């Protein structure tokens, strides 16, 4: 084949083959990755069996970074270079960050987005988040044993365009193909809709480490409709930690604290908050670098009193979300609790009293968002098991493909694939020094482009010049739930990219689809014979070009008789290519390949000698 398909694990076009996709909850405090196996969503753990990855990155002098639990341990010893809750900084300027004066980091107020100075250099929130995402990607690939097609990444409903784009950029840096950004409350609703088969109006109360979101959703026969959203992008479990930290400083009458001591007390505050969810009181003991010591006892009642105003701050946007949906508390059938912060008993109590119902929390609030995202990722990747009827999905009526050399069609998404879905294949260049590739998107079941429907064309330019077959161009087809096809082409070495969107069903009536299918059935034998002929003709052209290029470059390596023999074989290939006997073409190509083996060996010897020329033995 002129355009060589490089097989990529997990991205087969075979409709029966499961494509590996994951859902990622990129959280403020912790992050998770989940997938769907045997139609059941499950969280993927690390090699030690831990589901949660602390969203913490520690930069070291050698330029390396520690992520997760190893980084968590450095918060006390190296707080300035240990970045936590980076989600709060995504897409934000310095003036947008709450409590910035209490954070131990060295911020740079740069245009667009704040940056942080570390011993490993200046880092953006995008780069820091990419470290976390890359760790989750590796964790998933280790658990699943193959590469991922892509990921659905969740974001707070209140994230603006800058924050959402920053999340996409971080995923790209981490080597992830983003199938979709999904609002966290919607992901939770998907998980509960699958697990419980619930229907009606539900409020999703999502209090994470750094953000609060509330969504009012209507669930009808597995279809999710978002009626309204609300929230606060600067309110979360971290604020409860901060309030307890302030209480410790006040009660212990501490002098101004160093960054290290501040970090120690922040960890103590978080530990105390978590313990007070199950205990009536807990002790806070800390020895500070300043020589001061802290010995305090805090009760659950104290904690409720000092944080009650924060709980009230979540109820206000909840009321507004109900008003926006033109609903009252009586219209709500249930409340879904999401986020680790919702484990605090006084939060569950306040939410239950407001909605006059016991909140739903039978799915782990730390995992529910990742599980819902995994379900969505599984669908977007084109996987659908028998009985998966929780969402009304359409199918692709005709295969979507790409033109390859010789006017042939390579099918990328087969007909009857459920949508939304995404598939990718890799292709390469046909000629030496080729710097551009024309992408022709076609629709139909026939083997030749001339017999299929042309949808769109675009070009990928800026491919670095290299030998034919050396470049790797990944072409990705993605069809969303509305049937919109987006095609992107990316040269993997340079990163140059081009894309286009098209509506494949536009202007195509049902009878036309039926006729195209009938034509493909009637012409199947003829089409396959033509395809075989074209493939051999393309291969013949490729080997002729390669041989002529080799003769031009290194013809001096051959004697006159040898050169005449190669020229004769070349002529035989060119002559057979004009006919319609693909067996004859194949035989001529094989004869040329065998007849130039010695020539190829001499060229290799010359290349090796040239490469080693002038070098000493110990340099090799």
Swiss-Prot record:
Gene3D superfamilies named among the record's database cross-references: 1.20.1270.10, 3.30.420.40, Actin, Chain A, domain 4, Substrate Binding Domain Of DNAk, Chain A, domain 1
A biological-process GO annotation: iron-sulfur cluster assembly
InterPro entries the UniProt entry points to: ATPase_NBD, Heat_shock_70_CS, HSP70_C_sf, HSP70_peptide-bd_sf, Hsp_70_fam, ISC_FeS_clus_asmbl_HscA
Keywords: ATP-binding, Chaperone, Nucleotide-binding
UniProt cross-references to Pfam families, sorted A to Z: HSP70 (PF00012)
Molecular function GO terms recorded: ATP binding; ATP hydrolysis activity; ATP-dependent protein folding chaperone; unfolded protein binding
Function summary: Chaperone involved in the maturation of iron-sulfur cluster-containing proteins. Has a low intrinsic ATPase activity which is markedly stimulated by HscB.
Family, as annotated: Belongs to the heat shock protein 70 family.
Protein name: Chaperone protein HscA homolog
Organism: Janthinobacterium sp. (strain Marseille)
Lineage: Bacteria, Pseudomonadati, Pseudomonadota, Betaproteobacteria, Burkholderiales
Gene: hscA
């Amino acid at each position: 084949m002129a355009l060589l398909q490089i097989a990529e694990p997990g991205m087969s076009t075979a409709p029966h083959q499961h494509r590996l996709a994951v859902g990622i909850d990129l959280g403020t405090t912790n992050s998770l990755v989940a997938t769907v196996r045997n139609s059941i969503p499950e969280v993927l753990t690390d090699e030690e069996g831990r589901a949660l990855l602390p969203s913490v990155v520690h930069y070291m002098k050698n330029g390396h970074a520690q992520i997760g639990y190893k980084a968590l341990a450095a918060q006390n010893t190296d707080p300035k270079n240990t970045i936590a809750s980076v989600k709060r900084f995504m897409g934000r300027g310095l003036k947008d960050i709450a409590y910035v004066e209490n954070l131990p980091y060295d911020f740079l107020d740069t245009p667009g987005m704040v940056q942080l100075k570390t011993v490993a250099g200046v880092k953006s929130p995008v780069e820091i988040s990419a470290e976390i995402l890359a760790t989750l990607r590796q964790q998933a690939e280790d658990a699943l044993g193959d590469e991922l097609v892509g990921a659905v990444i969740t974001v707070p409903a209140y994230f603006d365009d800058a924050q959402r784009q920053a999340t996409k950029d971080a995923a790209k840096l981490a080597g992830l193909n983003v199938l979709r950004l999904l609002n966290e409350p919607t992901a939770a609703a998907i998980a509960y809709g699958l697990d419980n088969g619930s229907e009606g109006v539900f409020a999703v109360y999502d209090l994470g480490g750094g953000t609060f979101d509330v969504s009012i959703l209507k669930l009808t026969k597995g279809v999710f409709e978002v009626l309204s959203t609300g929230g606060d992008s600067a309110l979360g479990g971290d604020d409860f930690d901060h309030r307890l930290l302030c209480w410790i400083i006040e009660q212990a009458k501490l002098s101004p604290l160093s960054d290290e001591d501040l970090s120690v007390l922040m960890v103590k505050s978080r530990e105390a908050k978590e313990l007070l969810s199950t205990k009536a009181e807990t002790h806070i003991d800390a020895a500070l670098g300043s020589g001061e010591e802290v010995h305090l006892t805090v009760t659950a009642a104290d904690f409720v009193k000092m944080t009650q105003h924060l709980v009230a701050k979540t109820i206000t946007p909840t009321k507004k979300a109900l008003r926006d949906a033109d609903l009252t508390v009586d219209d709500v059938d249930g409340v879904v609790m999401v986020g680790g912060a919702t484990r605090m008993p006084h939060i569950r109590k306040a939410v239950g009293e407001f909605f006059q119902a016991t909140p739903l929390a039978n799915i782990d609030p730390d995992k529910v968002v990742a599980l819902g995202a995994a379900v969505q990722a599984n669908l977007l990747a084109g996987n659908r098991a028998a009985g998966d009827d929780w969402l009304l999905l359409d199918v692709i009526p005709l295969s979507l493909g790409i033109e390859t050399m010789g006017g042939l069609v390579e099918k990328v998404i087969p007909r009857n694939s459920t949508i939304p879905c995404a598939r990718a294949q890799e292709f390469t260049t046909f000629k030496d020094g080729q710097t551009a590739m024309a992408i022709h998107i076609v629709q139909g079941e026939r083997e030749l482009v001339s017999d299929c429907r042309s949808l769109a064309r675009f070009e990928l330019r800026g491919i670095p010049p290299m030998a034919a077959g050396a470049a790797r161009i990944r072409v990705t087809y993605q069809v969303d739930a509305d049937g919109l096809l987006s095609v992107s082409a990316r040269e993997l070495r340079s990163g140059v990219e081009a894309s286009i969107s098209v509506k494949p069903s536009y202007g195509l009536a049902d009878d036309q689809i039926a006729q195209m299918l009938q034509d493909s059935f009637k012409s199947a034998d003829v089409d396959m014979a033509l395809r075989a002929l074209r493939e051999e003709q393309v291969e013949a052209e490729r080997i002729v070009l390669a041989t002529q290029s080799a003769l031009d470059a290194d013809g001096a390596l051959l004697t006159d008789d040898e050169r005449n023999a190669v020229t004769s074989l070349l002529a035989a290939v060119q002559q057979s290519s004009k006919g319609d006997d693909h067996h004859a073409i194949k035989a001529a190509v094989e004869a040329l390949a065998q007849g130039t083996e010695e020539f190829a060996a001499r060229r290799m010897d010359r290349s090796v000698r040239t490469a080693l020329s002038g070098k000493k033995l110990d340099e090799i």
